[in-house]
């Protein structure tokens, strides 16, 4: 099983998860051309895709969805609320409704040899979800765009072998930054985005011996830095009430606009 961030940041997100036989993208919030280039770097093309899992309808998650769907007739998996919003978005171009596949929170579905299990998240979108994807007993979690987490979130993300988790902003950078007040409040709110520190606190509750890799994703260009995100999360893990140190795990920050190193989950 492989996990690879093709791009992850507040300006565009596209994550690859696959096995030898099945190839999925989680979101296409970048251009179709860039998504294809990312697939090419993995030895794949758009024709190899078995599905696109959409977390929610914001443009940094769906900008290239229409292009990829039309060119390759790839099935699109999303919640009812998200699919309804996508169909209203004129800037994506027409997408054949026959490609739409409805998913429901906490209801598993099978795409060839992968099992997909959507999970609820708290974000200001119609019906947003994160995804847990399993190949046999190996599991990957993709969880970004959540303003808060709770016991449900923790239970959903326990037992992952690899996890891509949001570390969107440094609170101090956001507070003194150029964003207008209403936008700062949105980001800091319960339906906004997870800060570096809260990302680390969430991780402290789900770490386990068999966790192979942690990828910090969806960093804000204006309100975060890769080194800040990494260090804040590292400190939360090391100083938190858990038996681990950050150095016990492979941890990286996903690149905003370039393909990140591939994580092979064995």
What are these model-derived regions, one by one?
Residues 63-72, 87-90, 224-231:
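Metal-dependent catalytic neighborhoods of phosphoester/phosphodiester hydrolases
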Residues 1-42, 129-145, 162:
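Conserved beta-strand hairpin/beta-sheet module of binuclear metal-dependent hydrolase folds
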């Amino acid at each position: 099983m492989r996990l690879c961030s093709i791009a992850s940041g507040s300006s565009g997100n596209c994550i690859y998860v696959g096995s030898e036989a099945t190839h999925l993208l989680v979101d296409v919030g970048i251009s179709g051309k860039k998504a294809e280039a990312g697939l090419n770097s993995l030895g794949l093309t758009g024709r190899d895709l078995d599905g696109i899992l959409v977390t929610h309808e914001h443009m940094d998650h769906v900008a290239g969805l229409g292009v990829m769907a039309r060119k390759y007739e790839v099935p699109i998996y999303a919640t009812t609320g998200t699919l309804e919003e996508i169909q209203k978005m004129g800037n994506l171009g027409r997408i054949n409704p026959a490609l739409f596949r409805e998913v429901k929170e906490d209801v598993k579905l099978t795409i060839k040899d992968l099992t997909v299990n959507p999970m609820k998240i708290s974000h200001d979108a119609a019906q947003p979800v994160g995804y847990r994807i399993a190949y046999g007993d190996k599991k990957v979690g993709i969880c970004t765009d959540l303003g808060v987490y709770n016991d449900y979130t923790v239970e959903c993300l326990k037992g992952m072998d690899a996890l891509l988790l949001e570390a969107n902003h440094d609170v101090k950078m956001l507070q003194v930054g150029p964003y207008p007040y209403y936008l700062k409040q949105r980001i800091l709110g319960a339906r906004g985005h997870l800060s570096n520190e809260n990302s680390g606190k969430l991780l402290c509750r789900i770490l386990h011996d068999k966790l192979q890799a942690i990828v910090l994703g969806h960093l804000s260009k204006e309100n975060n830095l890769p080194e800040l995100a990494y260090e804040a999360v590292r400190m939360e893990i090391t100083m938190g009430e858990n038996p681990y140190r950050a150095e016990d795990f492979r941890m990286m920050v996903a690149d905003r606009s370039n393909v990140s190193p591939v994580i092979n989950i064995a």
